């Protein structure tokens, strides 16, 4: 086995973190992060999303590295369409949840200073705590990982000659993706902690 260059590991990690900040990833995880007012819980949702995403990348990466194949373009496009439909469904669900929870804002002033406060009147009678959908977040990450796997694996196949180096690269990329998603979901939830 050839020596794994540290620069490739670092590059894989940084690409994973950057990958988490892609617009479609932010849109997907924001639908979960917006449903709670805890940075810790949002971070966990991001972690599970990143874990699902990384599992998909790892499984497809293993197949591609083992068989030395690429994903056909028609399959890649089909997976992208599935992710697009999933994002629309998540967006509609977020709008319906905001409506159900009666999220709104109030304009008012303190002396000369005018500002806006957002808040919610949840439509539950007993104000029961909702269980966070960690498995849902992981499933969305898994589906998202299927769609993004083509670009990652082409990059890996072009850059490395060894199965093991490719596998380690995908694992490091996944760890970066998980760390990035935890950061993204924490940042997104910050305003909701103030509601």
What are these regions (language model features)?
Residues 1-20, 42-47, 128-143, 168-173:
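Small-residue-enriched transmembrane helix starts and helix-helix packing motifs
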Residues 11, 41-116:
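Membrane helix-loop-helix hairpins that form the core translocation module of multi-pass transporters
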Residues 21-27, 146-154:
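Transmembrane helix boundary and interhelical junction motifs in multipass membrane proteins
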Residues 32-42, 159-163:
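Juxtamembrane helix-boundary/capping and inter-helix hinge elements in multi-pass membrane proteins
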Residues 48-56, 136-147, 180:
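Select subsegments of transmembrane alpha-helices in polytopic membrane proteins
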Residues 61-86, 156-166, 171-174, 179-195:
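Transmembrane-helix boundary and interhelical-loop signature of multi-pass inner-membrane proteins
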């Amino acid at each position: 086995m050839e020596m794994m260059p540290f620069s490739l590991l670092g590059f894989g990690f940084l690409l994973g973190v950057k990958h988490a900040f892609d617009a479609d990833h932010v849109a997907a995880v924001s639908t979960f992060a917006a449903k709670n007012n805890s940075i810790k819980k949002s971070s966990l949702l991001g972690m599970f999303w990143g874990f699902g995403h990384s599992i998909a990348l790892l499984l497809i990466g293993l197949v591609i590295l083992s068989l030395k194949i690429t994903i056909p373009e028609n399959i890649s496009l089909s997976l992208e369409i599935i992710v697009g439909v999933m994002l629309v469904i998540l967006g509609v669900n977020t709008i319906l949840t905001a409506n159900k929870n009666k999220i709104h804002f109030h304009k008012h002033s303190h002396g000369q200073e005018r500002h806006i406060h957002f808040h919610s009147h949840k439509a539950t009678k007993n104000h029961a705590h909702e269980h966070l959908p960690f498995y849902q977040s992981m499933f969305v990450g898994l589906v998202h990982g299927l769609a993004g796997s083509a670009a990652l694996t082409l990059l890996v196949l072009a850059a490395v000659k060894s199965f093991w180096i490719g596998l380690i690269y995908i694992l490091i990329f996944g760890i970066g993706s998980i760390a990035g998603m935890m950061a993204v979901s924490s940042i997104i939830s910050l305003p909701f902690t103030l509601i």
